[in-house]
Design a protein with these regions (language model features):
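N-terminal cap/lid segment of alpha/beta-hydrolase-fold proteins
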Residues: 22-62
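Gly/Ser-rich "nucleophile elbow"/oxyanion-hole loop immediately N-terminal to the catalytic nucleophile
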Residues: 56-63, 108-147
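Active-site glycine-rich loops that stabilize anionic/oxyanionic intermediates
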Residues: 64, 71-75
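Short amphipathic alpha-helix adjacent to the substrate-entry channel of hydrolases
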Residues: 78-97
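Short glycine-enriched nucleophile-adjacent loop
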Residues: 149-159
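Active-site-adjacent alpha-helix of alpha/beta-hydrolase-fold enzymes
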Residues: 183-257
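Alpha/beta-hydrolase-fold serine-hydrolase catalytic core, especially in secreted/extracellular enzymes
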Residues: 224-226, 233-303
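C-terminal outer-membrane/trafficking sorting elements
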Residues: 305-388
Length: 388
C-alpha cells in the first residue's frame, strides 16, 4: 500500500522512488551505558546502517536519526527483529534497552533508561573513539510495544529533546502513562490492534490518544490486529494472548506489513524532515481498507486533506513573501503555517481572493501551509530561502 500511496500522490513519486531505493546493511553492537546519577547500568543492543552486515562493522557515512525502542513485558528485545530489519536499511539507528526484563519491572526506571540512552547517543556522536562518531543526527524518536509503549509516554512527558513518539499496543503503566499524556505535545503516532485482548484499545490506547496535547496525533487501528503480532514470535506473549483470543483472523506478517506502510512515511516526515511524506502518510490513511484511524492536528480534526489546484501559492520557493490565491467560495477560512515539526507559527483569516503573506522574519527551511474551512482542510508546502 505504501507504493500504491506513492503512485496516487503523483507529485511526490520521485521522493518515493528515492525512499524505497535506500538499502543499507544492518550492523549491530552492544553497549552498556552507565547512568551515574542513578548508579545504573543500561545494557543496550544497537542496530545501525552499515555497508556490511555483522557485529561492530563501521557505520555507513551519514547522519542517522535515533530510535529508542522499549520491549513489552517479559518479551526479549530479539522479538523485535522485524523492526530493525525494516528500518535500519532505510537509514535509522535502533537502540533496544534490555533492562526491566523481570516479573516485576519498574516502569519509571525503564522510561528513564529511554531518556538516558537518547541523550547518550548524542554524546556518542561527539566521541571520536565511538563507532557512532559523526554519524548521528539530532532527531530522536521514542518507540515501544505494550509495556514499552506505555513507558514511552512516561519518557516523552515534558521532554523537549524528542521529535516524535510512536507506540504499538501501548499498555497502561505505573506511574500512569495515561496521566502523562496531558504533558506530551510532540507529534505522536499510536498503533492499535482492533482485536487486541491483552491491552484493548478502549481501555488503553483510546484513552491515551484522547489525553494527548500533541500538535499532531494519529491513532491507527489495524482491523483484526492482535497484541503480539506487532513483534515476532514470543512464547510468553503468544500464550497470554491465546488465553483471551486464540483465533486472530490476521497473519503476523500481514499486521507487520500494514504497520510498516504507515510507520515508514511517518518516520521519514518526523525524523528526516521530508515534508512530502506527511502527504503520503495521509493519502495512505484515506486509501487503506485495512485500518480505521483518528487524527487531530493543530487543534483541528482532519476530515479531508489534499493538495488542490484551485488554491495557489506563488512564488515557491519564497524569499520574503508569497501570494495566496483562493476562489471566492473558499473565503473566510484560516491559513495556518507550521514548521517542520508541526508547531504553529502563523495564523490568519483569509477574506480576499488574493492575499500577500509576509515571511521576511521566517528562518529559511521548509514549512507546511494548511488552509482550513469548516470540516475541510487543504495542505501544501513551501520552501523559504534567504533573501539575496
Amino acid at each position: 500500500m505504501f507504493l500504491k500511496s506513492c503512485i496516487l500522490s503523483i507529485n511526490f513519486f520521485a521522493f518515493c522512488f528515492v525512499l524505497l531505493g535506500q538499502n543499507f546493511s544492518v550492523g549491530n553492537t552492544s553497549i552498556t551505558f552507565f547512568d551515574s546519577l542513578r548508579n545504573r547500568n543500561i545494557n543496550t543492543e544497537i542496530y545501525y546502517p552499515s555497508d556490511y552486515t555483522g557485529q561492530n562493522e563501521p557505520v555507513s557515512n551519514g547522519a542517522f536519526p535515533v530510535i529508542i525502542f522499549g520491549h513489552g513485558y517479559l518479551i526479549e528485545w530479539s522479538a523485535y527483529e522485524n523492526f530493525w530489519n525494516a528500518l535500519v536499511p532505510e537509514g535509522y539507528i535502533l537502540c533496544f534497552p534490555t533492562t526491566e526484563m523481570g516479573f516485576t519491572p519498574n516502569h519509571q526506571f525503564f522510561a528513564d533508561d529511554f531518556k538516558f540512552i537518547a541523550s547518550q547517543m548524542q554524546i556518542e556522536n561527539q566521541n571520536n573513539s565511538s563507532i557512532f562518531f559523526n554519524t548521528i543526527s539530532a532527531n530522536t524518536a521514542l518507540m515501544g510495544h505494550s509495556m514499552g509503549g506505555g513507558a514511552g509516554f512516561l519518557a516523552a512527558e515534558n521532554n523537549p529533546y524528542i521529535n516524535t513518539l510512536i507506540n504499538f499496543a501501548a499498555a497502561e503503566t505505573n506511574p500512569s502513562a495515561i496521566t502523562a499524556t496531558q504533558n506530551i505535545s510532540i507529534p505522536t503516532l499510536i498503533f492499535s490492534g482492533g482485536d487486541d485482548c491483552v491491552a484493548p484499545p478502549v481501555n488503553h490506547q483510546d484513552i491515551m490518544y484522547n489525553g494527548l496535547n500533541s500538535s499532531c496525533k494519529t491513532q491507527i487501528k489495524i482491523i483484526n490486529g492482535g497484541h503480539c503480532y506487532f513483534a515476532n514470535e514470543n512464547v510468553l506473549c503468544s500464550f497470554g494472548e491465546s488465553s483471551c483470543n486464540s483465533n486472530l483472523s490476521i497473519l503476523r506478517n500481514e499486521q507487520q506489513e500494514i504497520t510498516n506502510n504507515f510507520l515508514k512515511p511517518w518516520l521519514d516526515f518526523s525524523l528526516k524532515e521530508n515534508q512530502s511524506s506527511f502527504v503520503v502518510f495521509n493519502d495512505s490513511l484515506q486509501a487503506s481498507s485495512r485500518i480505521t484511524y483518528s487524527q487531530f492536528c493543530n487543534g483541528t480534526a482532519i476530515m479531508k486533506e489534499r493538495s488542490v489546484n484551485e488554491l495557489k501559492i506563488y512564488p515557491n520557493p519564497v524569499f520574503s513573501s508569497f501570494q495566496f490565491q483562493i476562489p471566492k467560495d473558499h473565503l473566510h477560512g484560516e491559513i495556518i503555517i507550521l514548521n517542520i515539526i508541526g508547531h504553529q507559527i502563523f495564523k490568519k483569516t483569509i477574506t480576499k481572493k488574493l492575499t500577500n503573506i509576509d515571511l521576511s522574519n521566517f528562518d529559511k527551511g521548509s514549512y507546511f501551509i494548511f488552509y482550513q474551512k469548516e470540516n475541510k482542510s487543504w495542505i501544501n508546502k513551501i520552501i523559504k530561502l534567504d533573501t539575496y
